[in-house]
Amino acid sequence: MSSQLPILTVSQLNRQVKGFLENEIGLVHVEGEISNLSKPSSGHYYFTLKDSTAQIRCAFFKNRHSNSLLRNFNDGQQIVATGKLSLYEARGEYQLIVEEIVKAGMGILYQRFEELKIKLASEGLFNPERKKPLPRIPETIGIITSPTGAAIQDILSTLARRFPIARIIIYPSEVQGQTAPQQLVKALKLANAHKRCQVLILARGGGSIEDLWAFNDEYLARQIAISEIPVVSGIGHETDFTIADFVADYRAETPTAAATAVTPNCIELFNILDTAIYRLHDAIIRLVKGLQLKLNHLIDKIASPRQTISTYWQTLDYLERQLISAMTQFINLNINKVNIFSTQLQANNPKTQIERTKTQLRQLIMQLNQEIRIQVNQLKNQLSTNLSTLHAVSPLATLDRGYAIVSKNQRILFAAQQAQIGDTIDVRLAKGSLACEVTQIKD
């Protein structure tokens, strides 16, 4: 026996082997058949994973499998278990501490899914800022799904209940199988080419990962990203996620939820419309009242025709007095001159010259009197013209022709609908006014 090697106890050896297995080998994926599956009350699962020539004990602890599909697995099924190797020291048995279980054959699909997810995410296809907003009230809704599946019926019934006025266009496509991705892309391109829809629903019912695999196609994801029409995905159930969900402008948990997401609720919409109509009616009432106040203010600012005529009469009287005063001064001045001339003539006693001067004086007085009459007549004519003009534009002239001004509460009425049966209205005539009661309203 070599003296250089330490002597270990069984426990020490098992502990070293356990440390080596856990720290050096790391995470492994192991495919095999389940056997001896045990589900004790502790919540931990124990089973053996075997192939044709070997087997390994596996432990799947409760804190790891709470969301696992293991409850649906049974003895004899092929799975891929992912976990770390360890050693059960008490018996010296090494085992696999399982962290995840999938059906055999699904490991590659999950790997492809994660690789594509990372690739598209790095290109920014999942970024929220590149996603298009959904229309609030779409006129036409496009549906890309199988025309015979349960999903289309759920969508149509939801749309009919929430927003029956929307037009529906169905773009049929396979949603499962090898040709499904190409058909989904074709339907998406066709909807964009038509340009008739404001939003598209990409949907199918629930299923296994293989059933939903068509929606993990890279080319389909890129077509969703460049679609000019917003795309809402409603694929599978709430726990199902596909690449199409990440790229879509909005991800709904189910086809029914997708139909709900793209439509407004009719009752809520009617309430919004009622509120808008009430606000519009209130705004119109306020506008009309404001215009009525402005009109009344303008009417109050218009000068009374009688007051205007009175002002002109006063001006005319003033001008007449000024004219008479000027003429009187002029006559008196000339009389004084005549008297002076008469005195001078009498002093010289030139009888002939006096007679001639008297004759000239009489003619001058006649001319002055004639000029005064002409000036007075012209002023009277001008005054008459002004009075006629004022009378023509005066509301009083309209009243003189048999018309009347009707008012209610000192506000002029322009239409019969401004009064109601039983109202008391004032009717102003050319001479006097009447207080009347409305007994009938005619259009």
Swiss-Prot record:
- Cited InterPro entries: Exonuc_VII_L (IPR003753), Exonuc_VII_lsu_C (IPR020579), NA-bd_OB-fold (IPR012340), OB-fold_nuc-bd_dom (IPR025824)
**Enzyme class (EC, first level):** hydrolase
Which UniProt key words apply to this protein?
Cytoplasm, Exonuclease, Hydrolase, Nuclease
Alphabetized GO MF terms: exodeoxyribonuclease VII activity; nucleic acid binding
Function as written in the Swiss-Prot or TrEMBL entry: Bidirectionally degrades single-stranded DNA into large acid-insoluble oligonucleotides, which are then degraded further into small acid-soluble oligonucleotides.
Protein name, as recorded: Exodeoxyribonuclease 7 large subunit
Reaction catalysed? Exonucleolytic cleavage in either 5'- to 3'- or 3'- to 5'-direction to yield nucleoside 5'-phosphates
**Where does the UniProt annotation locate this protein?**
Cytoplasm
A single BP term in Gene Ontology: DNA catabolic process
**Could you tell me which species this protein originates from?**
Legionella pneumophila subsp. pneumophila (strain Philadelphia 1 / ATCC 33152 / DSM 7513)
